[in-house]
Design a protein with these regions (language model features):
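Active-site neighborhoods and metal-handling regions in enzymes and metal-associated proteins
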Residues: 6-10, 18-232
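Conserved N-terminal segment of EGF-like repeats
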Residues: 1-5
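Short cysteine-rich clusters marking metal-coordination/redox-active sites
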Residues: 14
Length: 232
């Protein structure tokens, strides 16, 4: 039997906190997880599942997160600095009752990550880094609201960019959309990774193998890790 925490009777209150009986809530899901485990599948632990209340809290956090990126979109232009972007994100986040998750996280000194041109990720904003016409910059924004985490990034083109850079940005967005389209109940993480990798390579690009996506919600970085290389 797959060991996924305490064992519940059919008429016990479900472990998820819904108040429903186990047989009316997560029993069928746990039975399916056990079947997969017995087949040799890697099964993620029960505590990664989010309750309805958790999901609503994460959505509220995500609304602030997206709003902060929209705030940047209204202001970013040639001549601004990545330090400006950091201040915009910080002020928007705080004004909406939230906390910038990166600030002081494992020593990170700023409220957002800004990665310009060839920087892959986790660039540190600076008042000395001035954006110029033709730059592309990734703004990686993470937000805590009422204890719930959200995390997203967005690519920005500064003024007019070269066709090559524009195509890179466009294909990257398409890769994200391909990965999202591959997500389905009882699917595999490899389905998502493969969709991202296949779309990138079909377009003539490569993926960064050392980094990937991750779970989020109750903590900043949760399992599972979602790589950009995989088999369906």
């Amino acid at each position: 039997m797959y060991d996924n925490g305490p064992v519940f009777g059919r008429n016990d209150e479900c472990w998820c906190g819904s108040g429903k009986k186990y047989k009316k809530c997560h029993l069928a899901i746990d039975e399916r997880l056990n079947e997969l485990w017995e087949r040799g599948e890697e099964v993620l632990p029960r505590d990664l599942l989010k309750t309805s209340a958790d999901l609503e809290g994460i959505r509220r956090s995500a609304a602030v997160n997206v709003g902060a990126l929209d705030y940047v979109a209204e202001r970013i232009a040639p001549g601004c600095t990545t330090g400006d972007i950091d201040r915009w994100v910080h002020e928007y986040t705080v004004e909406h009752g939230a906390i910038p998750a990166p600030l002081n996280y494992e020593g990170f000194p700023k409220s957002v990550c800004t990665s310009v041109n060839c920087v892959v990720c986790h660039g540190i904003p600076s008042d000395d880094e001035v954006l110029v016409e033709g730059d592309i910059v990734n703004v990686d924004c993470s937000t805590i609201l009422d204890g719930y985490y959200s995390d997203s990034s967005r690519m920005f083109c500064v003024g007019e960019v070269s066709p090559e850079r524009q195509r890179l940005v466009d294909v990257t967005r398409e890769c994200v959309e391909a990965g999202l389209a591959a997500i389905k109940p009882w699917g595999h993480l490899g389905d998502i990774s493969h969709a991202v990798q296949a779309h990138a390579e079909e377009a003539g690009f490569n993926v960064v193998r050392e980094f990937g996506g991750h779970g989020i919600g109750i903590e900043f970085h949760e399992d599972p890790f979602v790589g950009f290389v995989g088999q369906p």
